[in-house]
């Protein structure tokens, strides 16, 4: 009987030890892929939860989205954390901030055989992968504004109590997009446009979500957003009162991208996620949660409501190297008029 008891204890101890030794293996078999992104992407109503569900169903992993006010803020966080960062991917930089991202030396090549994208330019970048795109615009409420401005000059000419809300270009990609939009149209005369806009700027918010909430609450007449933003109200709410003001001179293009950090211990898994993101299945959640155009035909096609959005042509886009070289000076130029 004593021998049986001793044998039983030994068996139990072995089971405990073996179980403890197995824990790291189990954890390794179910790794966590951490994606730093902007708040709207990771929100309950954003594409994050749907992408998490779809990717986790096939990856034997946990997909964790960590949000900041905007993607530039997410990049700054990863910079501060250095090699100790938990981020495997930064998602939400764009064609205006790719150069800044590369300058950090945080990223590694994606090593993916990418599909042919339906975007406004040929994609050859070996580090960043595009996942959606759109065009910047000012959104207004037709119940308050019958005839919106069709140019920056017309906006400037409105009474000073006509207010817009914009985003900080140092922390927000739409905010930087406005800088580039004006620079693309006016070049060296951009500061004159900023001087004219300054009296109309109600506030400059850190990120897009805060500014759009201010607009919807009636604090401002127009908000810097996207030509596709009214698609949300039309498709999700059945409400057609919100529109994007069509500027005859054109709208600035934004292509959003994701990149893998060189410090990531999960680079193979990170590549798998980026590959998934640019499949029809991975693209499917984006149009009706992020309210941008997909980079390729999504599963189920594109909702017909998007066909009712304004035509952004001519589409504007500055040379990436020019943007990288001049961003700081252009931001300072704009802010000199807003102080």
Residue ranges and their predicted role:
Residues 117-120, 134, 194-198, 204-205, ...:
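Periplasmic-binding protein-like
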Residues 49-65:
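Short alpha-helix C-terminal cap/hinge motif
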